[in-house]
Every structure is written in C-alpha cells, then in structure tokens.
Amino acid sequence: MENISDLWNSALKELEKKVSKPSYETWLKSTTAHNLKKDVLTITAPNEFARDWLESHYSELISETLYDLTGAKLAIRFIIPQSQAEEDIDLPPVKRNPAQDDSAHLPQSMLNPKYTFDTFVIGSGNRFAHAASLAVAEAPAKAYNPLFIYGGVGLGKTHLMHAIGHYVIEHNPNAKVVYLSSEKFTNEFINSIRDNKAVDFRNKYRNVDVLLIDDIQFLAGKEQTQEEFFHTFNALHEESKQIVISSDRPPKEIPTLEDRLRSRFEWGLITDITPPDLETRIAILRKKAKAEGLDIPNEVMLYIANQIDSNIRELEGALIRVVAYSSLINKDINADLAAEALKDIIPNSKPKIISIYDIQKAVGDVYQVKLEDFKAKKRTKSVAFPRQIAMYLSRELTDSSLPKIGEEFGGRDHTTVIHAHEKISKLLKTDTQLQKQVEEINGILK
C-alpha cells in the first residue's frame, strides 16, 4: 500500500502541473490511493459530488499521467469513503453457509447503495410506481408478480429496482436478490453456451428469491435469449419468486417480443414513470443538494428546474455543473452564474417569446382543431373548449392585453377571454386529464 501511495503522490505532483491551481485544490488534492488490483487503480474521493466530477472530467488525464510514470495502462476507479465496505475488493472472503448457493453472488455487490426508498423523491409522475415497488418489497411475490415498470431514460426506474432489492435484503438478510440488465443476461447466456456451462447459468438465475432485470427491451429480436428468459420466468413464477422488470416502453410496444413473453409480462402490474413536474424537480434538486452538503439558493434551484425538464440525471448533472463552475471561478452561486454555467447545455437559456399564434397552433395539434376554427364562430364543444384553453394560455404565457387576445380569436369581446380564463383555471384544479393536456401543450411551446 505504501508503494501505491507513493505512486499516487507522484501522480498528484504531475497533475498539479497540468491543471489550474483552483482545479487541483478543488478536485485532486484531497484524493488518496485506495488499492491497485488487476491493472485497476482505485482512488478515494472525499464525497459523491467530487467522485462524479473526477470520473467525468479527469479519468483520461489521470490515466495518461500514470502511464507516463509507470509505462502501464491502468484503469481508474473512484469510490467514496462510505462505500468502501461494499466495494473494497481486498476484503477477506465472507464466511458463507456451505449449503448456500454461491452462484448468484452477494446481492449487495449488485445494488447501488445510493438507490433506496429513502432517497427516492416522490412526485405526481412516479407516485404509483413508487407505491407498487414498495408493496412488492414488503411482500415479494404476494403483491404484484411480475412488476413491470416502464418510462424514459433517467426517470427513476433503476432507482426503484435497487430500492426493492435493498429493502428485501434489509428485512430478510438470507434472501437471494439478483439485479442485472437484460444485456448482461444475454451476454452471460451466450457465454454459457460457448463454454458449455448452460446448467450453471440456469442454476444461477432460477434459484433466486427476487430477480430484478433492467431494460428488458434489449431482448427484442433475440430469439434464443427470449426462449431462455421465458423458461427462467416460468421457473421463478412457479416457485412464487418475485420478478421485477423495467423497460423504456410497455410490453405491447416492444418490437419482435414473443407473444408468450409479452403475455407473462402482463400477468402482474404494469406501471409507468413520467417526467417530473416542476415541483418534483425542485424537490429532487433540494434532496441532492442536502445529500452533498451544498447550500444552493432557491432562485438557482428554480432556474435549473425550469431549464431541465427531461430527466433526473440531466437535472442532477446540471446542479453539479453549476456548483463546479462556481468553485472553479471562485464566485457565489446565483441565477446569473447558473445561466453562464449551463449555457453550453442550454443554448437557448433566454426565455422563448411565445405568441398567440404559437399557442393556437400547439392547442390545435393536441385537440385536432384547425387554426381558422379558433377565429371562427363555431360553438361546438370540439372547437369551443380548445379555444377557451388557447385563450387561457394566451393570458398566462403572453403579455397581450385582453382586447388583443380577443382580437386574435375572431374579434371576440374581452369579457369572453376573462370567462375562458376563469373557467379553465377552475377546471385545472380538479381535472387531471386537462392538467396532462395543458402540460403537453406547454411542452410543445417550449
């Protein structure tokens, strides 16, 4: 270990020459060498924030520096102190019951310690998926089996799967919990055939209590792997073992998925996760800031939450970028600094000017109403209601006066605009379907 420390100290001296002083002081100075195993050098970072920044910005530079010093190509891995117990590859072997099946490995090694129910931020877009996941964790194979969670990238599907695993292990330490991606399942299956170890492969995945399999859409078009997973699914389900599956789309939309697999995925509960609303995005940022011990002004969180609405990973990444930028230029964090820090990833950070025409077009797209109908005298519900929504949004999203809005809707009186605004405002408080439609329109306008 002394040699490793000496090597890292030498590397730090070289790195100090290659980066700016603020960068070195902020990111590199407080790191230490943890271990060197099989051409992988593990470096300890002081906290999760620093680890993430080092991984994304300094891995290549560190590898090059170490190559110059040693002539060896070393892979770099970063850890944080609280995760060393789970990740230290030099720990002595754990004493296991001889009767216990080793094939599935230690479940803890496959679960991210950050992804628990406690760290999951609940919002309108994920509330049902969270409740279903917790129910499954509390009573595996008794609540919903399988549980199928689908949604876009970075919305929390993997977080919930890991949370289920952690909860099960915490309440039943002897439970065999296996988490893996369907890509890994496919690769291991192919290797087992090549190495004539198909029996070992089947024993590994058909003798677990909880199987958590991520990104099942990867199986699309892979007939042999689908066949194997079909039998794995049946074996586990028949033994009342819990299966949790995630995907970027519902089963019926996964192309070239065998019907028999599709039907089994639909046996239990299918739940989706949608992008977080503004309130949830702010809550996510607050939780992230608290976890990292960061003091972030509310105006900055609101700015980031308004600019990043696609997924949680990008949201947290934007926060990290703002904090890093503040540290590097040694300035306090405020909304102006946040805008400067994010200008490369939010090129149009200045608010978009929305016109009444834009609103009419967006509402027309959602409700299939022709542009000319917004100005026509038609009073059928299929036209009148979308027209009222467009008037409401024109009042909310533009600086146009009431008479101007009325003029753009066929010369209607300003009292008609007021009535439309009041009606839609009232409906939005209780009508969830309307809320979703207005949110969809807002998304188009952005």
From Swiss-Prot:
Residues that bind ATP: 154, 156-158
Subunit structure: Oligomerizes as a right-handed, spiral filament on DNA at oriC.
GO molecular function, one term: DNA replication origin binding
Description of its domains: Domain I is involved in oligomerization and binding regulators, domain II is flexibile and of varying length in different bacteria, domain III forms the AAA+ region, while domain IV binds dsDNA.
Region (Domain IV, binds dsDNA): 327-446
GO BP terms, alphabetized: DNA replication initiation; regulation of DNA replication
Gene Ontology CC: cytoplasm; plasma membrane
Chain residue ranges for the region called Domain III, AAA+ region: 110-326
SUPFAM superfamilies named among the record's database cross-references: P-loop containing nucleoside triphosphate hydrolases (SSF52540), TrpR-like (SSF48295)
Region (Domain I, interacts with DnaA modulators): 1-81
Subcellular location, record wording: Cytoplasm
Record InterPro entries: AAA+_ATPase, Chromosome_initiator_DnaA, Chromosome_initiator_DnaA-like, Chromosome_initiator_DnaA_CS, DnaA_C, DnaA_dom, DnaA_N_dom, DnaA_N_sf
The name this protein goes by in its record: Chromosomal replication initiator protein DnaA
Organism annotation: Bacillus cereus (strain G9842)
